[in-house]
Regions:
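Intrinsically disordered, low-complexity Ser/Thr/Pro-rich tracts
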Residues: 9, 79-80
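Alpha/propeptide regions of enzymes that mature by internal proteolysis
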Residues: 81-406
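Sec-dependent signal peptide recognition
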Residues: 61-67
């Protein structure tokens, strides 16, 4: 129901009201139009402040001169049609990615280097993380930028990998100048892969040095069984006997000059789902290992505490954007990016996982923080899917491509 001056009640199913800026001689005007959809058709009506109807339901109202320029810019921006396209994750700003691995031992590392420094935030949701220099990313800490992020295997043993990365960066003159020495600021998080290949072989400083060198000289990022994804697996609620091989995956997009992408090392306790279709694509195997079953349903078989739950799990991600944000904003974006985990991994963020996400800013593009958080979750979900689809069987563990196709 709607009313107009000087008239009775008009039965209406919907009222459409629009206001838009229009350029005319002498400045900018508002064009206001109210269109009432009646049961027997439409009636356009518009009234100025004095209650006088405008021609064909259109009223022109003068806009103050001080607002003219801003409204013209707003009108131009809102008229643009933004299109989204997929881009390589390696094309976002000055971040360079290098990988090194030991294929036989099924372990490796992936290093993200930004010689100019990058602002970074971190959000940890899992109950068992293995990490280094995480407090550097706390918004309350003094350092505003870091120089590298390391994702590696080896669990806590692999945390020494960052020492090799620091050595390589120091040799290249990259780091924070303390006045007495150059100190590269390097954060790190690891997955547990000691149960996959050789438990005595772990990423070490030499491997970290090589990955950092490659990042600077010959970036070699690839999805699949490479770098930190070399020993990644999923679906381990029953231990390693019924799990599947996954790896490292990436996905990135560009929209209106904004670039955002994610690299994910997929090593979860739970199962993996296509976030768009809801179809399970990896995880716990059936007894004959020819099909998938639900980890969540399996866990619902008993309410008793599980003392021997397999704890060798953690999914790690680095979200990269060319938008300009500070550490506090990046911590929030990293938190929103965890929605991508929740859409794709079930269960997720368990006490037996060390799920963590870094978010880094390497540009000056102005962008809405919440929009970037939404996109971060989406590229994380797509990167998880790529980690499944690009994985190959290894050490006796089948990949998704090895399962019988329906």
């Amino acid at each position: 129901m709607t009313t107009k001056p000087g008239a009775g009640i008009i039965p209406a199913t919907r009222v459409i009201y629009s206001r838009f800026p229009v350029a005319r001689k002498g400045g900018l005007w508002y064009a206001e139009q109210q269109e009432t959809k009646l049961k027997n058709g439409r009636r356009r009506t518009c009234f100025d402040d004095a209650g006088t109807p405008g021609k064909d339901g259109l009223c022109m109202r003068r806009i103050p001169a001080l607002l003219t320029a801003a409204l013209l810019l707003l009108s131009t921006a809102s008229a643009e049609e933004l299109t989204m396209k997929e881009i390589p994750v390696t094309s976002i700003g000055p971040v360079r990615i290098g990988q090194a691995e030991n294929i036989e031992a099924a372990t490796g590392c992936t290093v993200f280097v930004c010689p100019e420094g990058m602002r970074a935030g971190l959000d940890v949701r899992g109950g068992g993380p293995a990490s280094r220099e995480s407090q550097l990313l706390n918004p309350l800490m003094a350092a505003q930028e870091i120089h590298a992020i390391v994702l590696a295997g080896g669990s806590a043993y692999g945390l020494g990998t960052a020492n090799g990365v620091m050595k390589c960066l120091e040799e290249r003159g990259i780091g924070y100048d303390t006045g007495f020495a150059l100190v590269p600021l390097v954060a790190q998080a690891d997955i547990y892969d000691l149960s996959v290949g050789s438990p005595s072989v772990r990423p070490d400083p030499d491997m970290g040095y090589e990955a950092a060198r490659r990042a600077l000289d010959e970036p070699n990022y690839r999805d699949g069984n490479y770098g930190a994804g070399c020993g990644a697996t999923v679906g381990k609620i029953k231990g390693m006997d019924y799990c599947m091989k996954t790896g490292i995956g990436s996905y990135a997009v560009e929209i209106g000059g904004l670039k955002i992408g994610a690299v994910v090392v997929l090593n979860a306790l739970g199962d993996v789902y296509d976030w768009r279709t809801g179809e399970q694509i990896a995880g716990l195997l059936t007894e004959d290992k020819t099909a998938l079953r639900s980890t969540s349903d399996y866990m619902k078989g008993s309410i008793l505490p599980t003392d021997n739950k397999f704890t060798g799990n953690t999914t790690l991600a680095v979200v990269i954007t060319n938008a300009s944000f500070d550490k506090a904003q990046l911590c929030k974006i990293a938190g929103m990016a965890h929605d991508g985990y929740a859409r794709s991994i079930r269960p997720v963020h368990t006490s037996a996982d060390g799920d963590s996400i870094y978010a880094v800013s390497v540009g000056d593009v102005p962008a809405d923080q919440d929009l970037v958080g939404i996109l971060a979750a989406e590229v994380v979900s797509e990167a998880i899917k790529q980690a499944v689809e690009n994985a190959e069987s290894a050490c006796g563990y089948p990949a998704a491509r090895d399962l019988p196709q329906e």
